[in-house]
Amino acid sequence: MLAPVGVVLLVIAIGTAEDSGWAQAARDPSTDQRYATALKTAKRVGKPTTTTTTTTTQPATTTTQATVIESYDAVPFAADSPWNSGLGAGALFRSTSDPMTTNLRSSTWTPWVNAGQYSHPLIQASWSDPVVSMTCDYISGVGAGATTQFRVPLNATAAPGTDGHLHVINPERTQVVEMFQVRGSGSQRTCNYLVRNDLRSSGFGAGGTRAHGGSAIGGLIRSNELDGTPIRHALAVALSAGQLKQGFVWPATAEDGDAQWSYYGAVPMGSYLAIPLSVDVGALNLTPEGRAVALALQRYGAYVVDRASGVMLYTEPSLEGSSELDNLRRDMRTLVGQLRIVANNSPQSVNGWNP
């Protein structure tokens, strides 16, 4: 990921931040009864915290343990978010000979799944976690050189590498604090950029920490989603500069700040990709992990959200070194070979629901 330039320039250009909660599932085109049942039981939560300082009468403690989100049956953002809407019944795919398709499949760099450097640690804070002060070069909606406070487990650590992402869900589970280039540890930390995203929103829009302009946690493969739990959301995918084309498309609101001279491909930031329903996933000779992701790409698709060395998906860091992740990585070239671009994705036809 080459987001540092894009994020910094985005901050300079936008300067400010800126619909409901964790949706258990969304519209699903499949006939899988589990998905249909989940859709009927979509969750809603209360209003988000909007202040820049978190206060509470509940006691804090320094005895903490960082944990990822506990409600693994839930997915962030509104049920009608593009992340959760599912592949539309009217989706129109670009042909296999279309320049965008051939460019998407042409990378000489081996497709990969990122779980270490440049990945996105996602932490669920509790009321017992201490309040941490975070001083940032820029806080969306606040300004430069600002400090904010919120609850963070003291042992929560940012991803290794130059991006240093760290994302923290508030105890109310209504908001995620997303950070870029986090430094330090304990109760006093710094970061380059911080934005608060409403977990009941679409997950897209200006002010996010990813190159496409929206939330960084949208499309993240969580650790249990490779052990048999169905993936009920679209995936986040990054492409190389040789695959990306300058000029982002909906629902992206931005691209890397150097796009005009670094992008030389055919696929715009924000493009929606999927495996057509006509593809027999069972005939692709995939591992269980690869099949899980293939089904997600066929039921929910993927959004182009960032730049990397080649086609790349993202998982929680806890999967690094696991056999599940190794299996998925081995299947990536097969998966990419089945991806096509949905031509009729727009605000009027989210994920191709209207032909």
Whereabouts are the PLM-identified features?
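Compositionally biased, intrinsically disordered low-complexity segments
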Residues: V8-A17, P48, G116, N155
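C-terminal region of N-terminal signal peptides and the immediate post-cleavage residues
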Residues: L10-L39
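Fungal extracellular serine/threonine-rich, low-complexity, intrinsically disordered "mucin-like" regions
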Residues: K40-P48
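Extracellular mucin-like PTS domains
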Residues: P48-T67
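Short, surface-exposed polybasic-aromatic patches that bind anionic ligands, especially phosphate groups
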Residues: Q65-P355
